[in-house]
Amino acid sequence: MRREAEAAAFIRDRTLLLLGLVAVLFVTLWRLPALRSSVVVYCAHDAVFAEEILRDFEMRSGVKVLVRYDTEATKSLGLVELLLAEKDAPRCDVFWNNEMLGTADLAERGVLAPHRGPGWERIPEQWKDADARWTGFAARLRVHIINTRNPATDLDDLSRGAIAKPLYGTTLTHYTALWHLWGPERLKTWHHESRARGLREVNGNGMVKDIVARGARDHGFTDTDDFFDAKDRGALVAMKPVRIDGASICIPNTVALIRGAPHEATARQLIDYLLSAEAEMALAKSKSRQIPLGPVDENQLPAEVRELREWSAKCVPLAGFVKDRVECLAWLKSEYTE
């Protein structure tokens, strides 16, 4: 009887162990697709707007999105430099930039791989790389934000104006456009004279918006999404488009596939989604009121976005300014490190 009991216990223990191993194996195999089905995104766009779009992609696709955001103070430039540093051993799959020229520079340096999906096809030629290494979508405009309690009568008088430090983000794009269209010497003179006359530099477009909204400055240079944030909070502000020789500065988001991306298949899925009419319409209807670049149902666009589309009809051709950006940034770095 004792031997029979011991044998039964041995069989029971072995059975439980086997069942446990089977359960562990089942859970592991069940999780493997989820572990494989992920995508790593470096995102310079504001998290408050990007998060909703990325979570919607997760729900639709079942792909887990792992995001690394940048800070307001080093917007876009920090991630561009990180991607350059990781070029030989990439950790990122998709770069969602909040401007065009930094992405185009990465393409020239061999960091990006081509992707000709349905999203690339629907975006007009002026907003995408001919070799499909990057594509623009959902644009913003550079604008003057004006405090209407004490409205500036002369926006060229910058003694009560504000601007973000031009080393990064859309302010760097703004400076690059001036570098190309005015020439380096005129821009350098304007930069030095504006600072001498009292133009206040701060650490980001959001801070420009804040100090104008509370009346610490009468007007400033910012982007349309920051203007709408101030307006929606009840600030007494108005805006006018920044124009250079009659052309506005329209700055799209851009998306690109990283060369050697660890999760290439899901990266291509995400890029196609970001470049879809659905994603552009979602960003147009969001609080940022971004301008769709591809075809969408015009009747669904908010009135404010339709007005922005009119302002952007004639805009500076930024795509050809990559060399200017490199030169302008080199000068700016020398200015701010002396």
What is the predicted role of each segment?
Residues 4-25:
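N-terminal Sec-pathway targeting helices
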Residues 17-20, 30-102, 338:
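Early extracytoplasmic/lumenal segment of secretory-pathway proteins
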